[in-house]
Amino acid sequence: MSDKVKGKKQEEKDQSLRVQILVYRCMGIDLWSPTMANDRPWLTFVTMGPLFLFMVPMFLAAHEYITQVSLLSDTLGSTFASMLTLVKFLLFCYHRKEFVGLIYHIRAILAKEIEVWPDAREIIEVENQSDQMLSLTYTRCFGLAGIFAALKPFVGIILSSIRGDEIHLELPHNGVYPYDLQVVMFYVPTYLWNVMASYSAVTMALCVDSLLFFFTYNVCAIFKIAKHRMIHLPAVGGKEELEGLVQVLLLHQKGLQIADHIADKYRPLIFLQFFLSALQICFIGFQVADLFPNPQSLYFIAFVGSLLIALFIYSKCGENIKSASLDFGNGLYETNWTDFSPPTKRALLIAAMRAQRPCQMKGYFFEASMATFSTIVRSAVSYIMMLRSFNA
């Protein structure tokens, strides 16, 4: 039986990766395959093509509005979001074979642990449920932001009609085009282009981010299983006792290697996610403060909310891996180490020294942690106030 068939059968059984499989299918990508053999490339082209082309009018708009803080902040918020999505798409394409291989590798490790220690199933199920709940919440928040973006122009039209003002056709995202957008025959296809670009930006971001959730929660499951096996390690003495300890330490080592591998592949993305999200929160937060309580501010509120949630979840994933890796060290002290034989105690001492060094997900200058999240939010609020003073 092929790895792909095994993976699909196991997915049907434990119901993990459901959200990830769905969002990747929406982009025409088969997450179970390390190649494009089972993809629908036409769907990927139809979704990502408009987003790549959409960067041109947005860059032109950023240049056009360079002296207008309000319009520039609106334009740059969308531009940075699109740029980040394109980076995520290219990152997945470049590392696809490794990511898919890592999925099978993690699932094989966990399946083997269930055979060795049946109680591991409960830990794995809890972590996968948390992953799916987080991925589903994340999907809903980003979907809501996309819906608000599509509806934003109609809110302006309705308000203009109620006030009796002249109707001015607007787009979900600012851009500069070589034709008059007030002409309906030009406006409609451009609006659809904007909506398709929004769909691509939201869905591709969900693909790569939700896959990170799967990796982090399952690595945490490996660390937790290693901790519980360590706590319940019997003090039987002799070679059998030492062999049992070695098996647990090997499992912990696998978790460390996978965590380091994930951190290495996601390092550029973590850096851009934190850096660009901080800039986006500044610019879009300025729009919220400038427009509130205008109904059009609902879109920007949803946008800022999705940015904060994305930043929070990245920080939470990094914090979870860090805590789980350190928690394994606590498990070493909860064992019956006083009853172990001298060779086992010596091995346990070395393991305790290594467990003091946590796994960290870093994006060069940024560590994915709750402390970094708090710092960015506090700094963003200060910059929003500064932008408001420029616009006063």
Swiss-Prot record:
Q: Origin, by domain of life?
A: Eukaryota
Q: Where in the cell is it found?
A: Cell membrane
Q: Output the Gene Ontology cellular-component terms.
A: dendrite membrane; plasma membrane
> Keywords of this protein's UniProt record, alphabetized?
Cell membrane, Membrane, Olfaction, Receptor, Sensory transduction, Transducer, Transmembrane, Transmembrane helix
The regions listed as transmembrane in this protein's record are: 42-62, 75-95, 142-162, 203-223, 269-289, 298-318, 363-383
By its UniProt entry, which Pfam families does this protein fall under? Answer: 7tm_6
Q: What else is noted?
A: The atypical heteromeric and topological design of the odorant receptors appears to be an insect-specific solution for odor recognition, making the OR/Orco complex an attractive target for the development of highly selective insect repellents to disrupt olfactory-mediated host-seeking behaviors of insect disease vectors. Odor-evoked OR currents are independent of known G-protein-coupled second messenger pathways.
The entry's function note states: Odorant receptor which mediates acceptance or avoidance behavior, depending on its substrates. The odorant receptor repertoire encodes a large collection of odor stimuli that vary widely in identity, intensity, and duration. May form a complex with Orco to form odorant-sensing units, providing sensitive and prolonged odorant signaling and calcium permeability.
Give the record's family classification.
Answer: Belongs to the insect chemoreceptor superfamily. Heteromeric odorant receptor channel (TC 1.A.69) family. Or1a subfamily.
The protein's name in its UniProt record = Odorant receptor 9a
Source organism per UniProt: Drosophila melanogaster (Fruit fly)
Q: Name the gene behind this protein.
A: Or9a
